[in-house]
From Swiss-Prot:
Family recorded in the similarity comment: Belongs to the gamma-glutamyl phosphate reductase family.
Function statement: Catalyzes the NADPH-dependent reduction of L-glutamate 5-phosphate into L-glutamate 5-semialdehyde and phosphate. The product spontaneously undergoes cyclization to form 1-pyrroline-5-carboxylate.
UniProt subcellular location: Cytoplasm
Record's protein name: Gamma-glutamyl phosphate reductase
Taxonomic placement: Bacteria, Pseudomonadati, Campylobacterota, Epsilonproteobacteria, Campylobacterales
Keyword set, alphabetical order: Amino-acid biosynthesis, Cytoplasm, NADP, Oxidoreductase, Proline biosynthesis
GO cellular component: cytoplasm
Coiled-coil regions, chain positions: none
Main localization of the protein described in the UniProt heading: cytoplasm
A GO BP annotation: L-proline biosynthetic process
MF term (GO), any: glutamate-5-semialdehyde dehydrogenase activity
Reaction(s) the record says it catalyses: L-glutamate 5-semialdehyde + phosphate + NADP(+) = L-glutamyl 5-phosphate + NADPH + H(+)
EC number: 1.2.1.41
Gene source species: Campylobacter jejuni subsp. jejuni serotype O:2 (strain ATCC 700819 / NCTC 11168)
Amino acid sequence: MRNLLENIKKNSQKLLNLTPKDKEKIILKLAQILRENFKIILEANKKDMANFTKSGAMKDRLLLDEKRILALCEGLEKIAYIEDPIGKISKGWKNYAGLSIQKMSIPLGLICVIYEARPSLSAEIAALMIKSSNACVFKGGSEAKFTNEAIFTLVNKVLKEFDLQDCFAMFTQRDEILQILAFDDLIDVIIPRGSSNMIQEIANNTKIPLIKQNKGLCHAFVDQSANLDMALKIILNAKCQRVSVCNALETLLIHEKIAKNFISLLIPEFEKFKVKIHAHENALAYFNNSNLKIFKANENTFDTEWLDFALSVKLVKDCDEAIEHINKHSSLHSETIISNDASNIAKFQRLINSSCIYANASTRFSDGGEFGFGGEVGISTSKLHARGPMGIEDICTYKYIINGEGQIRE
């Protein structure tokens, strides 16, 4: 294992020698080969889906169909045309001694990405790594074994064409990843995408820095001044469009003075999707005449990521109480306020600590593609290095370039 990782680290220099046009060409070729061979990917995915016996969020994340593969290819093409971040000078100045000092972007180095389900990441991450000149080792979940292998085989064909096959590796066995976690002298950072238990297990077994994507415990607060038609549209999109994703809504906070009117609008729409309601005792009565399944909230309700047609609901007396609740229970992912009160919006966006804070928009936009990044390595809920959807610039770091004319420090 050490020899393999040392070889990847050594060969990563090839990525630094790629021109922006080289990278564009490689990534476009990657999109092309995936599009031309989508049936191979679908066949592999059918095997994984047949072997996967659980239902719910992970099954949806595991699924690939023609539409999702074509969307993946379109995302890769967007990545291809994004400005190359490497070698970019973000600032420059001269110091008192006349030294020219510049801050230049560089790759993080050798990145390990560990992910559950989501086999499309095998291609998306490869494109992002090529664009940012990072070497990478991949570890996909066993539930997506056949799909990951099919996609990475196609990725590797493109890498071989450009003599980059030694800059990347995919691992499929659990014991291999446990070995990798020991090489903090070779791997620069780990980006885990999966359950809280998986992320915690990795953190407990390595000294390598992690950029974490915690669970997506996303909140919405419908303020007293909200346009209720707008609020209804946003809540339905955030909760019901795709429940298996980390930017889906999990907790709804409603100003107590509009609770009756707004919940009466919500109920018939939620009945269409059979949304299960986990209501705080102050909200229970408002759902009594509905055909929804209603549960009284317990001590764990507001810390639960449902990843299902289920929603925690609580009434609050004002924006301050909403902010206090969110900061207590949030996973630091995405939160939204629906309001026409500019001061409450400003307060909400200033005082909440999460990585993405919306006003009058759905949390479903927390995504690298939606942010214009082309794709994402993950959505970081960490506070160090990167936060929110991680595009190409977020898997770069920097160094200082200093040029002089014989200066010495007196």
